[in-house]
Amino acid sequence: MATNADPAPTKKPRNSRKALKQKNELVETPPSPVSVKGKSAKSFEQDLMEMQTMLEKMKIEKDKTEELLKEKDEILRKKEEELETRDAEQEKLKVELKKLQKMKEFKPNMTFACGQSSLTQAEQEKANKKKKKDCPETKRPSSSYVLWCKDQWTEVKKENPEADFKETSNILGAKWKSLSAEDKKPYEERYQVEKEAYLQVIAKEKREKEAMKLLEDDQKQRTAMELLDQYLNFVQEAEQDNKKKNKKEKDPLKPKHPVSAFLVYANERRAALREENKSVVEVAKITGEEWKNLSDKKKAPYEKVAKKNKETYLQAMEEYKRTKEEEALSQKKEEEELLKLHKQEALQMLKKKEKTDNLIKKEKATKKKKNENVDPNKPKKPASSYFLFSKDERKKLTEERPGTNNATVTALISLKWKELSEEEKQVYNGKAAKLMEAYKKEVEAYNKKSAATTSS
């Protein structure tokens, strides 16, 4: 086997000593132990200072985190309280909803009398018109002039075939005026007979209507009373149901029921457990288990506090009951006083009413006496210009339009008076002025005569 041959020795260069010398010059001299000690002390102080600043920063951060945690705990606690109150409100709403759902509706059991009219006013009027059409006795009788016109109409139309309704009416009107009293008599008698029959029927109907109205009013009153009784019974039943189902509203002044020994202990422990971020349910469970495991000796101070609370509660309740009784008595007295006051006011009002009624009666009596004592010979005040015109026109209109009601005639007269010119009105104004002059003279004469009689 062939072995590797050792390398041939190389010759050192001549300038190697110079290079070593330069190398040695470049290498640093080792530091002295004193200088090393000083440097290490300085670096330790710096490290210590840095550590202190770091610790301070960490403390500040810790405080900040603690504050943030506290804030978060407070927010969580508030949210829990809000949820609790919301749950309580929801429960209340559910209870109220159940109450409303269970609440009865007022359904009256009414049997309306057959006498009570279910028709509306318009339907009633329609029925009355139909009744008048079917029954000729209920129709208003035609006047003697209209009866005569009916008899003469065909004859006049034969004589004047080209005449229209107005012309025919005018011809008949002229003929009626020229008729003697004997010729008019049979038509007037016929009209009187029909009028009497009509008045009898109307009087009977009116009496029947009045009787039916009285009956209807009586039935309505009875129905209203029955309805009121039913409603009052319904209200009473509803109140009784509410008394059974619902508790009375709490009085804010009423002393609160004392807490038990367990609740005293639980209230004491709650704050500490809440600091540990325990929920309300967890707090309740923990305090319950702790209370069970407590010995009688440890329970004793809490039971002592509970007993003391109960004693103070009983004393407060006695005081509360006493004040309530006093309030009830004072309220009763106030109500009695108020009732007396109302009675007094009512009596005063009644006296005033009686007084005014008596005054009205006296006034009426004095007026009646004055009217009785009026001298029949005393001149009467003359008619006005409009009244004179109205008198003339009424006569004309009744002849032209027989059977027209009084209200329509009055309205027509008023319209005609407005349509008159000043010259036309002057005729009636002159007549009224003459009558007024004559009236004044008569009054003067009357006054002189009455003065002479009184002096004698």
Curated annotation (Swiss-Prot):
Assigned GO CC terms: nucleus
Pfam families: HMG_box
Biased composition (Basic residues): 11-21
Keyword terms of this UniProt record: DNA-binding, Nucleus, Repeat
Molecular function, one GO term: DNA binding
Biased composition regions of type Basic and acidic residues, renumbered to the chain: 240-254, 354-363
Name of the protein this chain belongs to: High mobility group B protein 6
Organism field: Arabidopsis thaliana
